[in-house]
Regions:
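Active-site neighborhoods and metal-handling regions in enzymes and metal-associated proteins
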Residues: 1-599
Length: 599
């Protein structure tokens, strides 16, 4: 079946139930950004494969909302589907609640699978449509009725992340989170977020490709904890270790009756942005709900010193692999056939040679030429093209190691470049260097820092339609919150102060449709710079250690400060990576990291 047929089948089920609009999100039951194959309902119905987007199906039409990272990709993948692309954030594009208000009749029904819609999203829809007495029909997953060959729920084995990697023991983390629960006046904390559960219990799994989490919910009380999980995924040894820390097991789907059975007078902590609508609707009468951001988010984001040191180790391993890849690509292009997919496989194989490599941290975004303008382009058998000894290769990739999670982008000159290509690369790199060198007072947020990265592009009347930075988990998701670097306060759901120990990306870019794309990305860790009578100053330490491409630079556009920053960074790269290279690779690294003279 194709998207047109899939939508027709869904509309037939909607008509049987008198449903006027059906909402299909990207999320799983845990509001995850990246989901297992079972949960790719929006992709099944629309054909759009991006990691962010919401589909609304009406009886005679459909629309899909996505953000600026995916405008070009979505326009291509939705072509011929009959689905209208809604470019989020652009003038005249309605938000989904307003669209539903305008397109669902009085006393109508909006359908969705209430296990996949966050409580906050359902609340915003409900508030907007209430004046028309529109009701929800959220008890049935209609997509499941029409997706006849739907993959089963993943159930991969759990494994333990030792404290020598994680820093805190499971018991220490449970104690710290219980302290937060008490501070918030709650008796029970319902935790649906997969990354938060994995972090808290020092467990990892394999139920989401590239993200080592496992399908589960956790009920944390003052004296006990209940992990709702597929028991087949838990070994007897891990079950015993959990029991020793006061964590009992229950079936995965028991979360709803467990929440419903909480006695009157119980105060339940729930994060309405992370909890699905069915969980919140399961809370019984007389039970008080405390809807607050999960305290685990910030605890997880502020990396333990042991995690930070492990991340440095992981990034040296990763830096060696990516540096060797760039050397191979530059010295092989034009001599042997190389395509986007073959280059991606080469990069993965080089990483796999490293110690403690577990997997990639996301599907590689490896593009050549015009494909680079598709921000999250991923090569497929159908889209794969050969690379030629000119223009840019944009390589955005990452890995999971026992020591941490990596994410790096390098835009690589494969030969001759146009003046425009060099100009854009240089402007992007200048912004990247400026943000990387930031020194700022504690209290700044990502909105404060973002302009440092965009300033060179803004001065030229240019911009990129994505955030400059996102948090990164520790052997977890390559995207995590609560920190985010983006200037537009209207896009921020929650404003987060940048704290010591946070790890986030520094990745400005620029994309010219039909021509090329440029992005340069390092991960950085926030460290204390100094404290004096003016306050506590923080700075950013680069974790990523891979050379920039001097072949892509227009040196006339660099300031003396730019050159100083680049030279300092390249000195760090050479010191960290050179001990692991030899022969021609080492000689090349020495050459490409040698100091540049200004002027």
């Amino acid at each position: 079946m194709n998207p047109v047929e899939n939508l027709a089948a869904l509309r037939a089920e909607m008509a049987k139930r008198r449903i006027d609009a059906y909402v299909v999100v990207t999320d799983d039951f845990h509001t995850s950004e990246y989901v297992g194959e079972h949960f790719k309902a929006r992709e099944f119905l629309s054909g759009f494969t991006g990691s962010a987007g919401t589909l609304v199906v009406l009886p005679e039409s459909a629309a899909l909302w996505t953000d600026g990272r995916y405008f070009l990709q979505a326009s291509q993948q939705l072509d011929g589907s009959g689905i209208e692309l809604m470019r989020m954030g652009e003038a005249g594009v309605p938000e989904i609640p307003a669209f539903l208000h305008d397109n669902v009749p009085e006393n109508g029904f909006i359908g969705f699978d209430s296990r996949t819609i966050s409580n906050d999203f359902a609340r915003r829809i409900g508030e907007k449509v209430s004046e028309k007495h529109i009701r929800f029909a959220g008890d049935e997953d209609l997509v499941d009725l029409v997706w006849t060959d739907r993959p089963a729920l993943s159930c991969e084995p759990l494994w333990e992340l030792e404290p020598k990697f994680a820093g805190y023991t499971r018991a220490e983390k449970l104690e710290k989170v219980r302290e937060k629960i008490n501070e918030l006046g709650a008796d029970v904390f319902v935790i649906p977020a997969l990354d938060e559960i994995a972090w808290l219990l020092n467990l990892r799994g394999g139920d989401v490709l590239y993200t080592p989490v496992f399908l589960s919910y956790l009920l944390l009380e003052r004296g006990k904890a209940t992990l709702c999980v597929q028991k087949e995924a838990v070994s007897a040894e891990i079950e015993a270790h959990l029991a020793a820390d006061g964590v009992a097991l229950a079936p995965y789907d028991d979360i709803y009756p467990l929440v419903a059975s909480l006695p009157k007078g119980t105060r339940v902590l729930l994060d309405g942005e992370r909890a699905n609508y069915r969980i919140t609707q399961s809370v019984g009468t007389g039970v008080e709900t405390i809807d607050r951001p999960s305290p685990i988010q910030l605890m997880k984001a502020m990396k333990h010193p042991v995690e930070q040191e492990n991340e440095r180790i992981a990034h040296i391993r990763d830096g060696v692999a990516v540096t060797r890849f760039i050397y191979w690509l530059k010295h092989t292009i034009g001599k042997e056939p190389i395509t986007e997919m073959s280059a991606a496989k080469k990069l993965e194989s080089l990483r796999a040679e490293g110690e403690h490599f577990l997997d990639q941290s996301f599907g590689p975004i490896l593009s050549y030429g015009a494909h680079g303008a598709i921000v999250h382009y991923a090569p497929t058998e159908e889209s794969d093209i050969p690379m030629e000894p000119h223009g840019f290769c944009l390589a955005d990739s990452g890995a999971q190691y026992y020591e941490g999670t990596t994410d790096i982008t390098r835009t690589i000159a494969l030969g001759a470049l146009t003046e425009e290509e060099k100009r854009i690369y240089t402007l992007v790199l200048r912004g990247h260097l400026q943000l990387g060198a930031a020194k700022f007072l504690h209290g700044c947020t990502g909105e404060t820092l973002d302009m440092l990265a965009r300033a060179p592009l803004w001065e030229a009347g240019l911009d990129y339609n994505h955030g400059t930075g996102h948090g990164v988990g520790f052997v977890l998701g390559v995207h995590e919150g609560p920190e985010r670097v983006h200037w537009d306060v209207n896009r921020q759901k929650r404003h987060c102060v940048i704290e010591e120990g946070m790890i986030f990306s520094n990745e400005p870019g620029m994309y010219l449709a039909g021509k090329f794309g440029v992005r340069v990305e390092n991960l950085v860790v926030v460290r204390k710079a100094e404290e004096n009578e003016y306050g506590r100053f923080l700075a950013l330490e680069p974790l990523t250690l891979v050379p920039y491409d001097r072949d892509a630079l227009d040196l006339t556009l660099l300031t003396s400060r730019d050159v100083e920053l680049m030279n300092d960074y390249h000195a760090k790269v050479y010191a960290a990576i050179s001990p692991y290279l030899a022969g021609d690779e080492l000689a090349w690294l020495k050459d490409v990291t040698a100091p540049v003279t200004f002027g």
